[in-house]
Amino acid sequence: MSDPLPSSFEDNPQFEEETGLQKFRRRLKEEPLIPLGCAATCYALYRAYRSMKAGDSVEMNRMFRARIYAQAFTLVAVVAGGMYFKTERQQRREFEKAVEERKSQEKRDAWLRELEIRDQEDRGWRERHAAMEAAANEAAKKAAVKPTAEQDAARSVIEAADQKSLGVLDAVMELMSRQK
């Protein structure tokens, strides 16, 4: 179903599965201005808070303006980075989709192998069971086909005794007379 990954993904070590920390570091290296803008915003808020506690309203207003500028810088960095790294992100999405397809195909193949193994085990069990049943039927047929002379004589005496309603003594006497 899924084709092998294109060669552009194979040679590039950047396109590998990554942990959360690796992803954070990669994003930090790709767009260093965004964390810088966030840090500037936090610093401006911290300075505004200290100015407010000290009662310096001029410095506080100046820091609030600096916070607005830092937030604007962060937004510009986000938009510019998004435009700059658009193709790379699209390639990364394609790669992640290909990796997901490969994983799902591997899971499906493993599931099919497991089903085949179970099917083979089931067939083997059925064959063994059928062979045992056939052997038992064959043994029963052999036992039924070849009655021994004693069994035949005893059977005929019993059948004759049942038909004539003879007593036990008469049946024994008849059996003794046949054996002589």
Swiss-Prot record:
One of its GO terms (cellular component) is mitochondrial membrane. Residues 5-96 form the HIG1 domain. Keywords: Coiled coil, Membrane, Mitochondrion, Transmembrane, Transmembrane helix. It is a multi-pass membrane protein. The keyword Nucleotide-binding does not apply. Gene3D superfamilies: 6.10.140.1320. It is found in: Mitochondrion membrane. The keyword Acetylation does not apply. GO terms for biological process: mitochondrial respirasome assembly. Pfam families: HIG_1_N. Residues 88-108 form a coiled coil. Cytochrome c oxidase subunit which plays a role in assembly of respiratory supercomplexes. This is Respiratory supercomplex factor 1, mitochondrial. The lineage of its organism: Eukaryota, Fungi, Dikarya, Ascomycota, Pezizomycotina.
